[in-house]
Each structure stands twice: as C-alpha cells, then as structure tokens.
A protein has these predicted regions:
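Generic enzyme active-site microenvironment
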Residues: 273, 307, 333
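Switch I (G2) and immediately adjacent beta-strands of P-loop GTPase domains
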Residues: 54-66, 70-74, 254-282, 300-303
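Short glycine-/small-residue-rich Rossmann-like dinucleotide-binding loops
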Residues: 242, 277-278, 302, 309-310, ...
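Short glycine-/polar-rich loops that comprise or flank the Walker A/P-loop
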Residues: 16-18, 51-53, 300-304, 327-330, ...
C-alpha cells in the first residue's frame, strides 16, 4: 500500500457527457469528504460502504461548482487494491480540472502517468503482463487487437507462463535435490523424462514467440508502402483503402512527387499507408528526390503493396521493383482488371507472397486486399482469446527462457551432466519470472509504466 493519496482525471480529455476524477490511497475518503457533499445530509462520505454511490455537489471551499456522483471502493476490493473514490462530474474540461485542483487542495497529490495501474501491480491486483494489457486495450483499434489485450488482461498469458514455470520448477526441485544431497537416496532423472518436460515447455514458448509478429500487427498496426510505376493506380488504391479522396489522382504521370501518409483500418489491421512517387527514370530533380524517398519507404515498410498496371506489358521498372520486393512481406496488386490484360503476372510470381488482380476503382477490391493482407501477416490464424506476447520486453524475456530451455536440452543430449541442465533451467525460470514481473527490476517496471497516460 502507498502512503500518499493521488488524484487525476481518469477519462479522455475534452468535452463529453461525464468526466471521472479518481482518488486512490489511504486518505481517499477523507479527501472526497472535503470536495463532495451528499444531497442527503444524513449520509457520511467517510463511512460510505464499498460498491455504493452517492449523489451530491462538488465544492471548493464554500462554492458548489457542479453536481455529480461519487462511487466508493474499499480496499482491497478496488482497481488499485487501495481505498478508491471515483467522482463523476459533467464532462467539461474546466469542471474536471477544477475538481482535480480541489482534491489536491484537500490533501491529494497529482497522479503520475500509469500510477493507478502501477499501484495495482505493486499491491498484487495484477501481474506485470496484465498491467501491460491495460495499455494495449486502451490503444486497440480493431476487434481482434482488443480481444488479444482483453485475454491478457484476464490473465491468459500469466496462466500460460505459470504452467510452464510449474513444469520447470518441479524439474528443478528434483534436480536440486539430486545435486545438493548426493548422500540421500534421490532417484536420478532419466533422459527420457527430461526430454519430455523440456521439450513440451520449449514447444509452448516457441508457439508464443512465433505468433508475436501477427499479434503485434493487431495491437500496433503496420507501416505499409504503396509503390509502383507512375499511373499504375497507387493513389487510387490509397483513396480506396482510406474511403475518401486523400490523394490527388490525374492522368498525368508523376502527379505524386512526395510521400502521402494516411492511417486506415483495414479489417482488424491498422495500416499506416505511405503513397509514394512513381518509380521511373527522370531528369527532374524534385521527382528524383520523391523516387529516392519511395525506395526508402519500401525498404523500411512492414508491408508492401506493389501496384502494377495490368493493361500494359511488364517494363524494366516493373521488373526492378519485383526484384526489390523479393523476400519481403509484399503483395503484387495487378490493377485495372476491368481492362484487357497485357501483363504477364507469372514473370513476377516468384518475387511476391501473392499476386492478385484488382481494380482499385471498385469497392469489392478493398475486401480482396484486406483478406490477402490478413493471410500474409498471419492475423487470420490468431486465436484472439489465447495467450499472446505483447511488446519487446515480453518477447525478449520469452526468447531468453526458450533459449535457456533449448540449452538444457542440448546439455541432456550432449551428456554434460545434471549440473549443466540445472543451470539452464534456473536461467529459464529467471526469464519467465521477469516476464510476469515477479523478479523484474525497478528499471523494467518504470519502463512499462512510462507508456501509460495520467489517470490510468
């Protein structure tokens, strides 16, 4: 439990129906009593039971400046595990700010970013992975991303890691007894049993790591470069995916000279689109700079949509683009399928994950592209209710644990003795405990909560 009582606006900034100011800490009820007067004079704020609500006025000194509701939560049955009071006022920014100022004048301290969730973690209300899921669910744009975050918030990842820790802990207890007490009649673990336990743990961790990239796409989105020759239909594609005329489209080649950016929601995936200048040889210095930026965006992108004009034969520029896309997460969109085809798609098939005929002027192509992107990025294979890793911290810890388990298996197979196996299992357990936050350093914890906004 923390000694200070904190206050902050817990709802989004700006005008709205209501705003919520949250108090948490040992003096929450006392602070609330100084800024909230119940409409029923027989009600005592400091004696309010948990999970109850009172209607009344918000005051600063003798000035009642708004009416609203106070919700009461008694420790440990609250979000933070502390005494909590949530004050719901009208949603104007000025009213909410004044209510926070009144709380601070009444003895509360301003909350730091993420301090409520940090207290929930420190008070044992949630694991570190669940705390990270809070931020993921706040920032989720799509249904699947929100479902993944909710699964972690509900403890799916913590439970899965707990299962693997339990298996390794049981193994380590037996190994430690055999190594540390040789005079006792402790049966030696046979290689077959070690292989079975370690192999199962490695398989589970491999599965989490394998699905990380697809999960990250659902949570965070992906940068997507739209590339191709002039007039292939790149800007038309951008407008199709955006749902409005974001880019200028003309029959004049080279209309787009700089990178045009637009974030769109394509199915459950947020694409940060970059419509680039048409790729061709040019003596125009301005256009040449745009083309240089086009190649740079292609090299940096997590997804490439390469647009080809299906009504014209392949050109040298088309082939150069295809070669640049080889081995990358790239989809070839052969545009203008509504016109007679003169494009030999077989020539570039080996350079792309998929080659798809589309018409960027038709709404139906949007669904086709969305399905192709989901297949390529693997998001259509993700179970949104299963355990998943979120963020580089969790991925790094899971990878260290997997590598340590692999080292233990190598020690078994190499006949290095149970001492070597025990050291590797210890390393794996340390990594898993860091993942869940059980032995995370103060620096790691600070890094996690730095991502949070004030009020959460």
């Amino acid at each position: 439990m923390q000694n200070t009582t904190i206050a902050a606006i817990a709802t989004a900034p700006g005008a709205g129906g209501i705003a919520v100011v949250r108090l948490s800490g040992p003096e929450s009820y006392a602070v609330a009593a100084r800024v909230f007067h119940p409409a029923n004079p027989n009600k005592n704020v400091e004696e309010a039971k948990g999970y109850t609500a009172l209607f009344g006025s918000f005051v600063e000194g003798d000035d009642a400046f708004d009416e609203g509701v106070a919700l009461f939560f008694r420790a440990p049955h609250s979000y933070t595990g502390e005494d909590v009071v949530e004050l719901s006022c009208h949603g104007g920014s000025a009213v909410a700010r004044r209510l926070v100022e009144a709380c601070i004048a009444a003895g509360a301290a301003p909350a730091a970013p993420g301090e409520y969730t940090r207290r929930a973690f420190l008070n044992g209300k949630m694991s570190l992975t669940q705390a990270e899921a809070v931020m993921d669910i706040i920032s989720a744009d799509g249904k699947q991303g929100a479902a993944l975050a909710n699964a972690s918030l509900s403890g799916a990842l913590a439970k899965k890691i707990g299962t693997e820790k339990e298996a390794l802990t049981g193994l380590q207890a037996h190994l430690a007894a055999w190594v540390d007490f040789p005079e006792e009649d402790v049966p030696e673990l046979d290689d077959a049993h070690l292989h079975t336990v370690l192999g199962q743990v490695q398989q589970e961790l491999d599965g989490l790591i394998k699905n990380y990239d697809a999960g990250a796409v659902l949570r965070e989105g992906v940068d997507c470069a739209i590339v191709g020759r002039p007039n292939a239909g790149k800007s038309t594609l951008l407008n199709l995916l955006a749902g409005f005329d974001r880019a200028i489209v003309t029959p004049v080649a080279g209309t787009t000279r700089d990178v045009v950016e637009q974030a769109v929601q394509l199915g459950d995936i947020r694409l940060n689109l970059f419509d680039t200048a048409g790729l061709r040889e040019t003596d125009d210095a301005i256009e040449a700079e745009g083309i240089r930026r086009s190649w740079k965006k292609l090299d940096e992108a997590g997804l490439i949509l390469a647009v080809f004009d299906g009504s014209e034969p392949l050109t040298r520029e088309d082939l150069a683009l295809a070669q640049r896309c080889a081995g990358r997460p790239a989809i070839a969109l052969v545009n203008k399928e509504d016109k007679p085809t003169r494009f030999d798609a077989e020539i570039i098939t080996g350079d792309f994950a998929m080659v798809i005929p589309v018409c960027c002027q038709e709404e139906g192509s949007r669904k086709v592209i969305a399905a192709a992107v989901a297949r390529l990025l693997g998001t259509n294979q993700i179970d949104p209710h299963a355990a998943s890793l979120s963020g580089q911290r969790q991925l790094a810890a899971a990878t260290r644990a997997r590598d340590a388990v692999a080292g233990a298996l190598d020690a078994v197979e190499g006949g290095f003795g149970l001492d070597a196996v025990s050291v590797c299992v210890d390393d794996a357990l340390d990594a898993l405990c860091e993942l869940t936050g059980e032995n995370a350093s103060e620096a790691v914890i600070n890094e996690v909560f730095e991502r949070f906004c004030v009020g959460k």
